[in-house]
Amino acid sequence: MKITSISVQQKNKERYNIFIDEKYNFSVDEEVLARYQLMKGKVLTEAEIEEIKQADMVRKGLNKAINFLSHRVRSEKEIRDYLRKQEMEAFAIDEILKKLADMDYINDLEFAELYTKTQIKTTLKGPRTIERELVEKGLTREIITQVIEEYSDEAQLENATKQAIKIMKRNNKSAKKMLQQKIITDLIQKGYTSELAKVAATEATSELDVADEAEILQKQIEKTMRKNKRYKPSIAKQKTITSLMQKGFSYDTIQSYLTENEISFEEEE
């Protein structure tokens, strides 16, 4: 089989169409063209053509991978998954990854270190969340253990407290006890240990005093009473107390407030 002509692709000047016996057969990257010294008149066997096509697949995949890496650093697994989505064959993926490693485009330890530092500085995620994300990105347990040590106890507490303050601002209608529990639960879900979550919750709510809680209770009582005034006095009172207890106020605190402020449900009927 003889190459009868070679033409540059119109949309990509770095790729060439190869015609065998006057018919289009395949296309190759400029680097592959030069490597295999493809030119008009050269005779190729079927095995040689298949080898050239495979080499071109690797070259094409390598270019795609480098472009993929140009946006940000990636783990080996992320690149492998990307190449699979590009419908690259297994042999090509393995060779591409080897070439990238030789070119220092892939280094999972450096990737994990950079990713962890970025998450610590730019997000309020806990260490367990970062660990889970690193697992999803294909990092080994050894690497994860090594890089997660960079998340110091001080940095964890600082980030957890910042997150706790955000949670507190979103839930400023609850009693302090309920608010602290909400903060602890949310922080655990965000990847912090229960011990650190408790410390952060205490730290974030440390400035809330009795006066603050009394003001919150007053607003909640007024709001709940308006909502329940369509009921009979006894039912309205029970519903109001139940609702307030669900927000973290104790029964005794509610009763004391109602008594001290001479709040009568009869008057709201």
Curated annotation (Swiss-Prot):
Its main location: cytoplasm. It is found in: Cytoplasm. The keyword Transmembrane helix does not apply. One of its GO terms (biological process) is regulation of DNA repair. It holds the Pfam family RecX_HTH1. The keyword Lipid metabolism does not apply. Keywords: Cytoplasm. GO terms for cellular component: cytoplasm. HAMAP family: RecX (MF_01114). Modulates RecA activity. Belongs to the RecX family. This is Regulatory protein RecX. The gene is recX.
